[in-house]
Amino acid sequence: MAKATLKTIAEYTGLSVTTVSRALKDGDDVKQPTKEIVKAAAKKLGYRPNPSGVGLRTGINYNICAILPVTKPGDIVGDVGSLALIEGFTAALKGTPYHLTVLPMAPDEDPMEPVRYAFENNLCGGMIFNLTKTQDERVAYLHDNEIPFVTFGQTEMSIEHPYVDIDNHDMAYRAARQLYEQGRKNIRLLSSSHDYTYAWHKYYGARRAAREFGYDFEIEKNIIFDSDVDDYRKLGNKLMSGEQAPDGLICGSEISACGLLAGIQDTGKTIGDDIDVVLVETCDLPSFFMPPISGYRQDFHQVGRKLIQHLLRRINGEPVKHLQTLQKTVYYQR
C-alpha cells in the first residue's frame, strides 16, 4: 500500500491540499468540523508527516537516537531486555512527530563513538543511552554540546542530568536478605562489569543485607563479574565443585541463570537443597526453568516509555530535577 500523503487525504475528503495541510496544523482559518474530518481521514489512511520535512519547516530535529549494546559474535542468545526497551520507546513516541533511530554499540567499541557520530552528523534532536559509569564521558560531552539526553542508569558526576534507573541497591538488598533469611550464609552475586554504576549499587545493597545478618560481603570473595565469565555452565560447575561452594546465588539475568543452573545440576547438586538461587529478570522466562526460579522483575517496557517521556519533556525545557526516576523491581515467587 502506497504511503499516504497530503494529496491522498485531499482526494479522500474532497478538500484542497492547502486546506488539508492547514487542518492538520490546527490552523485558525479552518473550521473545527473540517479539522475533525481531515484528522479522521489521516488516521484511517495511516498518514504520518515526513520528519525531515517537518524539521526543515520548524528547525527542529524530530529524530530520537537510542544507542544500545549488541551481542558479540558467538553469543547464543541476545539481550532479552532490549526488545522490551524498544517497544517502550515506540509506544511513548506514538502520536508525536518524533521518530526513533537505534544505533548499535559493539561490545569492543568505545562508548563515545556512536554518541560522537550521532552528534557530528546531526542525526537526532535528543539521545538515550545506557550502561552508565560513575564518571561518564558521554554525559559531559552531550552536556557541553547542549544536546538533550536521558540515561538509563545513574552517574556520580557533578552534572545533573535526566535519568531513569532500576533501584539496584534495593533489589540486591532484598535478594540477599531473602537468601540469608532462608539460612544461606555463603552467597555469590553475579554482577555486570565494575565499570558500571549499577554494579556498585548492587554490591552495596547485598553488603548491607550481609552486615544486618552478621556476615561479611567482599568484592573479591562474594562477587563474580560477568566480564570475567566465558561460559556460565562451566562457571556453575566450577563453583559447586570447589571446597567453598556457595549455598546462595544471585544471578544478574535470565541468560546467566540458565547456564549456571545447568552447571550446578551437572555436579549432581540440587537447587533448593544444596543451593538457593534468585535472579534479576525482565520477562517470565524463569518460570520455565527446571526448577522454576524466583526473580526480581525489571519492567523494561515501562523504563522505555519513561525514558522517552523524560527526553521529550527535557527537549521542551523542563528542569532536570523533575526528570530523574528510580524504579523498584517487583518480586515474582516461583
Question: Model-derived features: where do they sit?
Answer:
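N-terminal helix-turn-helix DNA-binding module of bacterial transcription factors
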Residues: 1-62
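Residues at secondary-structure transition points
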Residues: 4, 29, 33, 51, ...
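Bacterial carbohydrate/catabolite-sensing allosteric modules
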Residues: 12, 44, 88-96, 143-151, ...
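Short acidic/polar active-site loop segments enriched in Thr and Asp
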Residues: 16, 62, 125, 185-186, ...
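Amphipathic helical "hinge" segments at domain boundaries
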Residues: 45-113
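Short beta->alpha connector loops
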Residues: 106-109, 130-135, 255
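Short, well-ordered alpha-helical microsegments
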Residues: 112, 135-139, 257-260
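Short, electropositive alpha-helical surface patch
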Residues: 113-125, 206
